[in-house]
């Protein structure tokens, strides 16, 4: 039996040649929806590439974006001209492409067979859009599951999104009806230390006190370091801001990883890459290969536990700080996913921020499977 999902990907300095190679890999077969991810070298040719894949496949509905890196089954393309394409033979009533120019189905509306028309969405967003976090939360409120998966476009220059046409700015993607069986999980790139702390005094992005103690003293104590040791360890130390009232997939705390941006030894202050709230609970985290690999496998097996049979295809949206930068070898992260999830069609990209549920994350990977 032929799979309803087909995959093609290629790297070549010429956009047309790369697209032709990827299309040839798809082989014969129909489809109603396509995903296309390109690296930034091909941004100037995005419209031509979209026109070409529409003509060659006969598929009108396309979504995707640009990434400094993109991925396919067992492979990642980083800082090289490349394209990854996946087509999906889904019934036409099961999905709806949206953008600033095309509205998604109304929340509460139904398909002809009675399914929720707006159940779950794969989304791509422009990182330069003002109030992007509020926009993501608003979009999550427009699907009945409350779940989104995707990421912010990443490029050193201009970014583009595909949503039946080439668009820029805002948020776009595809909304699926509840007829489409989808599962999604998130993996963190950091391991939290065991202690939780309450932010008892903060000013903008500065942690002044934790548990009514100087923030820097608490951090050094948790890490088991003195100031000299911290200078070496700071690069791999992060802050996890726990999200009140929410639980991560697989149990445990749902937390947002933020950078440690500075310390003030004299005043015992810690600066972070976010503006926390007074009374918010946080923890310090360490980033290393072992914890990243372990949590990636945890995510995969959480997903597999929910599956009655092997998944048909997958999408992977990961932080640009992951991939080769975190796993030490190009393609190592994607090979791990293939090894443990199966040799199935997979496409995605390395994002400037990852979208899961109704939030924007960092240093994470969001894996979505079609059941």
Region locations from a protein language model:
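Small-residue-enriched flexible segments
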Residues: 1-54, 60-61, 65-314, 319-327, ...
């Amino acid at each position: 039996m032929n799979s309803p999902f087909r995959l093609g990907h290629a790297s070549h300095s010429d956009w047309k040649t790369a697209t032709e190679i990827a299309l040839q890999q798809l082989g014969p077969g129909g489809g109603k929806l396509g995903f296309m991810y390109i690296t930034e070298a091909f941004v100037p040719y995005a419209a031509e590439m979209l026109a070409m894949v529409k003509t060659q496949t006969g598929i009108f509905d396309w979504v995707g974006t640009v990434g400094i890196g993109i991925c396919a089954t067992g492979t990642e393309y980083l800082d090289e001209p490349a394209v990854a394409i996946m087509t999906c033979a889904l019934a036409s009533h099961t999905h709806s492409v949206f953008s600033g120019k095309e509205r998604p189905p109304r929340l509460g509306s139904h398909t002809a067979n009675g399914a929720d028309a707006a159940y779950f969405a794969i989304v791509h967003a422009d990182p330069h859009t003002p109030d992007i976090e509020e926009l993501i939360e608003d979009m999550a409120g427009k699907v009945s599951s409350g779940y989104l998966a995707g990421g912010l476009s990443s490029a050193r220059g201009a970014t583009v999104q595909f949503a039946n046409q080439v668009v820029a700015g805002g948020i776009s993607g595809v909304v699926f009806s509840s007829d489409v069986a989808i599962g999604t999980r998130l993996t963190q790139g950091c391991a939290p230390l065991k202690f939780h702390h309450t932010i008892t005094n903060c000013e903008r992005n500065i942690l002044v006190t934790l548990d009514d103690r100087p923030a820097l003293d608490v951090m050094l104590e948790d890490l088991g370091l003195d100031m000299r040791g911290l200078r070496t360890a700071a690069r791999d130390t992060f802050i996890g801001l726990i999200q009140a009232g929410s639980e991560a997939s697989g149990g445990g705390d749902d937390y947002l990883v933020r950078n440690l941006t500075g310390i003030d030894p004299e005043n015992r202050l810690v600066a972070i890459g976010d503006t926390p709230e007074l009374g918010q609970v946080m923890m310090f985290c360490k980033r290393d290969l072992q914890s990243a690999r372990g949590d990636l496998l945890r995510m995969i097996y959480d997903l597999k536990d929910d599956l009655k049979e092997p998944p048909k295809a997958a999408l992977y949206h990961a932080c640009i700080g992951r991939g080769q930068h975190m796993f030490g070898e190009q393609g190592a992260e994607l090979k791990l996913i293939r090894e443990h999830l199966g040799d199935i069609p997979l496409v995605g990209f390395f994002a400037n921020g990852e979208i899961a549920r109704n939030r924007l994350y960092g240093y994470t990977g969001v894996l979505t499977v079609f059941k």
